[in-house]
């Protein structure tokens, strides 16, 4: 469940499993490494180590429902003939899938726009980057099909030269930014104002994976509207405990044998958090 949000599932972030309490993200900084050769050993640069901490936060899902309402409907036979009913298996499967989907959606939102002070959330990447003076900030606006090319251009122009061209560099965009970009490509971005866009097919086409100025555009469903982040996926980290806790352990407990009640409980426990290593290698576009 935890790993089925689109940022994680599509490889937009590096997953660090088996983090029991915390994990240190080591950062190394050096100066110019190469110097003229001599007979003696002389350090050609200093090495500075700093760190950021990945500390997963514990979360839980606790739900309870009564089996009695199912007796009167078409699922009654699937509950068995005993007075100690069981939850209809089809509904139990649906309930597990429903919980897994809701958790995945919430985690996707937390990855980008979570706030640690809010129940059920941890600080997301936007909150962390906003508080970090080393992050490259770009002041944004409301993104539309008419201005999306210029706004994406501002982000790409702000990407550090050493980062541009990196294999895993992405432009993480909110859904509305992606829709605006696709509409622009279908209408006027490539072939001139009023033209039929990429391939001459207007908006009647599937563009598939798109790029901007050589950088892949990654739709991050958890990003709030009008936000854009440029970063390497290898610089963004999602930390959790055992992957089995995160992905498979949605438990359905029938309470009949435990307390004699007609209740069923749905339980899930997991840990999660995000962080990044290098703030100076992240560009954050924030709408004004």
Put a short name on every predicted segment:
Residues 75, 110-116, 166-174, 193-196:
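Short coil/turn segments at secondary-structure boundaries
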Residues 100, 104, 108, 175, ...:
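Internal mixed-charge
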Residues 1-32, 123, 127-142, 146, ...:
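Sequence/fold signature of self-assembling virion shell proteins
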Residues 2-77:
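Assembly/oligomerization interface modules of large self-assembling protein complexes
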Residues 67, 129, 175-177, 270:
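Short, flexible loop/turn elements at secondary-structure junctions
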Residues 74-158, 285-288:
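Alpha-helical scaffold segments that mediate packing/assembly in large oligomeric complexes
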Residues 150-188:
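Ordered core of a single globular domain
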């Amino acid at each position: 469940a935890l790993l089925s949000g689109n940022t994680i599932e599509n490889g937009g972030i590096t997953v660090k499993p088996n983090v029991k309490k915390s994990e240190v993200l080591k950062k190394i900084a050096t100066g110019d490494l190469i110097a003229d050769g001599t007979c003696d050993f002389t350090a050609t640069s200093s090495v500075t180590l700093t760190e950021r901490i990945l500390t997963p936060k514990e979360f839980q899902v606790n739900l309870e429902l009564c089996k009695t309402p199912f007796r009167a409907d078409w699922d009654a036979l699937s509950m068995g003939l005993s007075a100690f009913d069981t939850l209809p298996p089809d509904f139990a499967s649906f309930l597990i899938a429903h919980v897994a989907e809701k958790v995945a959606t919430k985690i996707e939102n937390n990855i980008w726009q979570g706030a640690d002070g809010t129940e059920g959330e941890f600080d997301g990447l936007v909150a962390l980057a906003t508080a970090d003076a080393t992050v490259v900030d770009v002041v944004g606006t409301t993104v539309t099909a008419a201005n999306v090319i210029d706004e994406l251009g501002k982000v790409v122009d702000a990407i550090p030269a050493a980062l541009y061209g990196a294999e895993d560099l992405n432009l993480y965009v909110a859904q509305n930014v992606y829709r605006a970009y696709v509409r622009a490509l279908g209408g006027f971005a490539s072939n001139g104002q009023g033209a039929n866009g990429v391939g001459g097919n207007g908006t009647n086409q599937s563009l598939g994976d798109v790029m901007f100025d050589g950088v892949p555009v990654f739709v991050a469903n958890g990003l709030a509207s009008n936000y854009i982040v440029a970063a390497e996926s290898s610089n963004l980290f999602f930390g959790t405990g055992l992957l089995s806790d995160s992905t498979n352990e949605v438990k359905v407990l029938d309470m009949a044998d435990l307390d004699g009640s007609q209740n069923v409980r749905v339980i899930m426990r997991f840990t999660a958090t995000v962080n990044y290593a290098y703030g100076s290698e992240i560009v954050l576009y924030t709408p004004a």
